[in-house]
Amino acid sequence: MAKKVLGFIKLQIPAGAANPAPPVGPALGQKGVNIMEFCKQFNAKTQSEAGMIIPVVITVYSDKSFTFITKTPPAAVLLLKEASLKKGSGEPNRNKVGTVTRDQVRKIAELKMPDLNAVNSEGAEEMIMGTARSMGIVVEG
């Protein structure tokens, strides 16, 4: 018989840097998950992407075991990295803080494709460009 699912936990954790401190510890502790075991597995799986924020969905089962799925970094984080910025604009409609090229948007869209609900790459690019606009980043080309 399959294990009964107790719940799901969604977190965004820096790659290779999961530790028992908040927000990881309290979120997992509430469901009774072995926090150190999760941290070891997550850090081992995401070591190659150091420095990026990685969304993770943790499935917790009734016997306190767990599985997790890592997703691609958020589009906003990827756009900031491509534009070499620390943060987006506080007033995106007035203050533009950086620019990215259409090729950079295409690269981000291809990377994000598995997590986006887009039919094709053009739709994915439009989503990424919308995110860029809402952050005050101009898309050239």
Swiss-Prot record:
GO MF annotation list: large ribosomal subunit rRNA binding; structural constituent of ribosome
Q: Which GO terms describe its biological process?
A: translation
Check the record and name the Gene3D superfamilies matching this protein: Ribosomal protein L11, C-terminal domain, Ribosomal protein L11/L12, N-terminal domain
* Modified how: One or more lysine residues are methylated.
In the UniProt record, which is one GO cellular component term? cytosolic large ribosomal subunit
Transmembrane region positions? none
- Listed CDD domains: Ribosomal_L11
Which keywords describe this protein according to UniProt?
A: Methylation, Ribonucleoprotein, Ribosomal protein, RNA-binding, rRNA-binding
Function according to Swiss-Prot or TrEMBL: Forms part of the ribosomal stalk which helps the ribosome interact with GTP-bound translation factors.
Q: Which PANTHER family match?
A: 60S RIBOSOMAL PROTEIN L12, LARGE RIBOSOMAL SUBUNIT PROTEIN UL11M
**How is the subunit organization of this protein annotated in UniProt?**
Part of the ribosomal stalk of the 50S ribosomal subunit. Interacts with L10 and the large rRNA to form the base of the stalk. L10 forms an elongated spine to which L12 dimers bind in a sequential fashion forming a multimeric L10(L12)X complex.
Return the similarity comment. Belongs to the universal ribosomal protein uL11 family.
* Family matches, as NCBIfam families: L11_bact
User: Entry's HAMAP family?
Assistant: Ribosomal_uL11 (MF_00736)
Entry protein name: Large ribosomal subunit protein uL11
Species per Swiss-Prot/TrEMBL record: Pelodictyon phaeoclathratiforme (strain DSM 5477 / BU-1)
